[in-house]
Amino acid sequence: DSAAPKGRLILPQVQVLREILDNDANAIIAKENKLKEALANLKRPPSLVITDSQVFGEIESIVPETIPFTSFSILFARYKGDLTTYINGVKAIEKLAKNDKILIAEGCTHHRQKDDIGTVKIPKWLKEYTGVDLTFDWASGGKYPANLAEYKLIIHCGACMLKRREVL
């Protein structure tokens, strides 16, 4: 994750590692360019591979289909929110039309990076995928626009800084 401070893991990674350790399981950490080697060095395949969403496609091409595979974002969607609601929201992407309004909401007020996933990457991906111009608004720190009904899609971060009840 390019937003990660040099020499540090981001909070979702730390929380997942803590959960793995608390459950007496093992965690192996590898960068995307070392994953193939790390998997080859194991005596048996891992129970699960977890990746950063920004390299999902790259990692998917490395991980054998027999190994379950997910992202930190999907884990946090299940842990902090209602995955069924999120899946239904993803279906709304197929119905997006020119100039539809999309809200991207983040639980915290972190400093945005030049290649920020919420303000740069997700809007770019959605425009590429739908092939139409879309209108984006952003909210952070739990402050939302008054009229949420005007948005055709609301995308929320993984909520690593929030409690589940705050997300629901």
What feature does the model see in each segment?
Residues 1-118, 125-127, 140-153, 161-168:
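C-terminal-of-GTPase-core extension/linker across diverse P-loop GTPases
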Residues 136-138:
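Extended, compositionally biased non-globular segments
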Residues 131-134:
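Short beta-strand/loop segments at the ligand-binding rim of alpha/beta enzyme cores
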